[in-house]
Design a protein with these regions (language model features):
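GST-like domain detector, emphasizing the conserved glutathione-binding G-site
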Residues: 1-131, 135, 145, 219
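Short beta-strand edge/turn micro-motifs at domain boundaries
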Residues: 19, 197-198
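Short, solvent-exposed turn/loop segments enriched in Gly/Ser/Thr/Pro and often Arg
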Residues: 32, 160, 205-208
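Short secondary-structure boundary/hinge segments and terminal tails
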Residues: 36-37, 190, 209-211
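Generic structural signal for individual residues within well-ordered alpha-helical segments
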Residues: 44, 95-98, 164, 186, ...
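Alpha-helix/helix-capping structural signal
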Residues: 74, 196-197
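GST-like fold's C-terminal all-alpha helical module
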Residues: 104-196, 203
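Acidic/histidine-enriched, glycine/proline-rich intrinsically disordered or flexible terminal extensions
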Residues: 205-228
Length: 228
C-alpha cells in the first residue's frame, strides 16, 4: 500500500496518474498546503522540504519499516522501479525517459510555476516578470513540441516522462499559451487526456475540497516562507 500525501497541484497529479496507470494500491492523504498542513512534524519527517507530493510505501521491497520519498521526480522513479512499469530497463531507453523527466523537474515545472505566480497570484503586476516567464514557458512548449514530432509519447513509449509533463500543460490557458501553436504537443495533450487512468486521476482530484486554498491567509503561508 502506498500512502500518497497529496494536494491538487500539477506535481500531485503526476503521482495519481502513475498510481492509476500502474494499478498499485494507494490511499490519498490530503495535505492542505493553504492551511499550513505541510508543516506538521510527522509530514516533515519524510518530506523535509515541506512540499507535496510525498509518499510512504508501507510494504517496501526490503521488508523494512515504511519508506518515505519526497520530490515528485524521485517518487515517479521509485514507483516505476517498484511496479517495473513505465521506465525501461535498457540503458538507452531508460535515459531517454530520465532526461525528459529531469527536463520537466528542472525546466518546465519551475518556469511554468513562476508563470503561474506572477500572472495569477502576485499581489502586484510586474510586467517584466510576467513577460519573462510567459516567454520562457512558450520556449519550453516549443522544445517539447519538437520532441513530440513523429512520435506518440515523449520518449517513444508511454513513460513517467509523459506523466510528469502533462499536468504542467493542463493549465496552458492560465500560462497564456495557445496549444494550436504547437501541433505535435496538442496531439499528445489530447492523447494523454483521453487515457482512462488520466481521467481517473483527475476524478480523484475533484474529490478533494480545495475551495479555500487561495485565501489571503493561504497566500501568506504559500508565498511568504523563510527558513525554519
Amino acid at each position: 500500500m502506498i500512502e500518497l500525501y497529496y494536494w491538487t497541484t500539477p506535481n500531485g497529479h503526476k503521482i495519481t496518474i502513475f498510481l492509476e496507470e500502474a494499478g498499485l494500491p494507494y490511499k490519498i492523504v490530503p495535505v492542505n498546503i493553504g492551511a499550513g498542513e505541510q508543516f506538521d512534524p510527522f509530514f516533515l519527517s519524510f518530506s523535509p522540504n515541506n512540499r507535496i507530493p510525498a509518499i510512504r510505501d508501507l510494504a517496501p521491497a526490503d521488508g523494512g519499516t515504511p519508506l518515505g520519498v519526497f520530490e515528485s521526480g524521485a517518487i515517479l522513479e521509485y514507483l516505476a522501479e517498484k511496479a517495473q512499469k513505465f521506465l525501461p530497463a535498457a540503458p538507452r531507453a531508460k535515459y531517454e525517459v530520465l532526461q525528459w523527466l529531469y527536463w520537466q523537474m528542472g525546466g518546465l515545472g519551475p518556469m511554468a510555476g513562476q508563470n503561474h505566480h506572477f500572472v495569477q497570484y502576485a499581489p502586484e503586476r510586474i510586467p517584466y516578470a510576467m513577460e519573462r516567464y510567459v516567454k520562457e514557458t512558450n520556449r519550453l512548449y516549443g522544445v517539447l513540441n519538437k520532441q513530440l514530432e513523429g512520435r506518440d509519447y515523449i520518449a517513444g513509449d508511454y513513460s513517467i516522462a509523459d506523466m510528469a509533463c502533462y499536468p504542467w500543460i493542463v493549465p496552458y490557458e492560465r500560462q497564456q499559451q495557445k496549444l494550436e501553436d504547437f501541433p505535435a504537443l496538442m496531439a499528445w495533450f489530447e492523447r494523454m487526456a483521453a487515457r482512462p487512468a488520466v481521467v481517473r486521476a483527475y476524478e480523484k482530484a475533484a474529490e478533494v475540497n480545495t475551495a479555500a486554498t487561495m485565501t489571503p491567509e493561504a497566500k501568506t503561508i504559500l508565498f511568504g516562507q523563510t527558513a525554519r
